[in-house]
């Protein structure tokens, strides 16, 4: 499964690579990283239909994760990738907006990697 992680905090890449070391080594999961919404859209345009799942932070400078979500769900229709939103703020407003825009799931930081692995394995 190819997963695109979108977060403006670059240390997220190291964290995911450590937490999913076994899955990456076995080829079960492959991660790519974008550090802004704009970079994520460029990646999706260059690798259309490759990312099956997108994990996106909500609060990023420039294009927010919610803006990115809206563009993904309207542009990539056949079928759009699964999008899980990640935020440090688990408030109802962000949750409701994300759901209205088509988010498939919603996680709060700090990410519970055991829970995330379980969710990802159900999609494989």
Predicted regions and their residues:
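A Lys-centered signature of the CheY-like receiver
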Residues: 8, 109
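Short amphipathic alpha-helix used as the core "switch/output" element in two-component signaling
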Residues: 42, 66-79
